[in-house]
């Protein structure tokens, strides 16, 4: 047993913060009890961590990351920039840094193989709990189909452990979903619009309705959720009408109120990924810059309208194109877009766990759930950016195991 006492508790469910709280963690890595300090009985000789003056909250969750990606250059995206051994070690370092920054769960939306989960289970590396898409799907000439402006084409996956992800037609799409599931996917990710390409804009549809329905149906048959990259236009509509579980980006969704209602009614999540579009607006290629700048205000409007419509908006960065380790920047951008700090925190905890289908075990500080907890020096409800200061992340616990402890040195 281990008890945290005296801190200001933010539960991840949007409840009123609890001052002078107590959280008791049992030896199985679960939360045994939570409540006001005077209402939680501690076992005899229970170790106590006094977090008075600090904030205790659930471990943060990024619903859209790419841990194996480093930039948008073709040589890197095609796996040609370095030996695979160097990339594996680089990813392991990124995973550890991500965990130590307070992120205890990541949904990786493409190109990370199941070996990293196995390595964590074997104690070879440390990192957040992982939900993997392995290979995203797209049709020929879609986002997953890698070709350069010069016409060069990459006919195989840059990772030989992963399927290529290219499929055309309902039957081939079903077969590719099965391949991706075989490769260890927890979630099926597909691209149904482009973005930042001369040949595929954010409003260009990738798959037709029959293909999308086949994809979603096959994924759900295998018990997998479906995440769809879609910016706007027919590709966005096709995905939502087919019943995808989350829309990634959705910048132009606010233009279609009926789709917002449909998402709210069927429980689909919106992952706006403001961070990556902030990058693209200033540092992307010319096509990406133009689209990101054009979409900026519509993107903000979409999130505001989604919240009003009852759509659950969750935090995801699309990290990997530019940098790793500053995932909490997304929460600052969500607040700048009109969400309250509490809404942004729920978007990165309780609702984020729901997006991953893990809300029965993580995301909130509740009795019986996994002890994924962080302690922060500061009040993120007063200043959400405090979560970006790694020196103010005082403790990180995942499954009851402490991975970062700056409290004992105080």
Regions found by a protein language model. Give the residues of each.
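Divalent metal-dependent hydrolysis catalytic cores, especially in the metallo-beta-lactamase
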Residues: 90-116, 127-136, 185-196, 225, ...
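Histidine/acidic residue-rich metal-binding segments in metalloenzymes
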Residues: 172-246, 250-270, 292-312, 360
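C-terminal cap of metal-dependent C-N hydrolases
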Residues: 348, 354, 367-410
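Metal-associated gating/positioning segment near the N- to mid-region
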Residues: 54-122, 140-146, 210, 241-242
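Histidine-rich, glycine-flanked metal-binding segment
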Residues: 2, 9, 13-57
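Active-site mouth loops of central-metabolism enzymes
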Residues: 76-89, 154-175, 225-227
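His/Asp/Glu-enriched, well-ordered alpha-helical/loop segment
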Residues: 221, 295-379
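Histidine/acidic-residue-rich catalytic or RNA/ligand-binding cores of hydrolases
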Residues: 71-75, 144, 199-200, 236-243, ...
């Amino acid at each position: 047993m281990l008890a945290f006492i005296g801190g200001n508790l933010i539960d991840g469910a949007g409840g009123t913060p609890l001052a002078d709280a107590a959280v008791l963690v049992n030896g199985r890595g679960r939360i045994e009890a939570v409540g006001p300090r005077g209402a939680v009985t501690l076992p005899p000789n229970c170790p106590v961590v006094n977090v008075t003056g600090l904030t205790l909250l659930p471990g943060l969750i990024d619903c859209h990351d790419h841990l194996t990606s480093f930039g948008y250059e073709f040589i890197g995206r095609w796996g040609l920039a370095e030996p695979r051994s160097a990339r594996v070690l680089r990813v392991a370092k990124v995973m550890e840094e991500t965990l130590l920054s307070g992120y205890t769960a990541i949904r990786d939306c493409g190109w990370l193989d199941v070996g990293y989960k196995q390595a964590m289970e074997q104690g070879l590396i440390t990192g957040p709990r992982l939900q993997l898409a392995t290979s995203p799907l797209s049709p020929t000439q879609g986002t997953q189909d890698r070709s350069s402006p010069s016409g060069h084409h990459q006919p195989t996956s840059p990772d030989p452990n992963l399927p290529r992800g290219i499929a055309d037609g309902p039957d081939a799409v079903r077969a590719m979903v099965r391949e991706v599931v075989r490769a260890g996917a927890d979630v099926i990710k597909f691209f149904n619009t482009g973005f930042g390409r001369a040949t595929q804009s954010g409003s260009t549809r990738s798959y037709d309705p029959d293909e999308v329905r086949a994809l979603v149906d096959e994924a759900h048959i295998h018990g997998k959720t479906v995440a769809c990259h879609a910016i706007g236009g027919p590709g966005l509509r096709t995905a939502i009408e087919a019943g995808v579980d989350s829309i990634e980006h959705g910048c132009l969704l606010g233009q279609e109120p009926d789709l917002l209602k449909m998402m709210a009614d069927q429980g689909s999540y919106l992952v706006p990924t403001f961070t990556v579009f902030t990058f693209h607006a200033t540092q992307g290629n010319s096509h990406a810059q133009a689209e990101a700048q054009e979409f900026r205000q519509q993107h903000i409007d979409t999130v505001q309208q989604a919240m009003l419509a009852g759509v659950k908006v969750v935090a995801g960065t699309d990290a990997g194109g530019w940098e790793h380790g500053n995932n909490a920047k997304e929460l600052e951008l969500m607040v700048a877009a009109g969400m309250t700090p509490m809404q942004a925190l729920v978007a990165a905890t309780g609702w984020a766990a729901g997006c991953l289908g893990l809300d029965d075990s993580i995301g909130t500080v509740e009795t019986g759930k996994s002890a994924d907890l962080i302690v922060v020096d500061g009040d993120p409800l007063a200043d959400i950016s405090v979560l970006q200061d790694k020196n103010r992340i005082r403790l990180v616990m995942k499954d009851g195991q402490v991975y970062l402890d700056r409290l004992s040195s105080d």
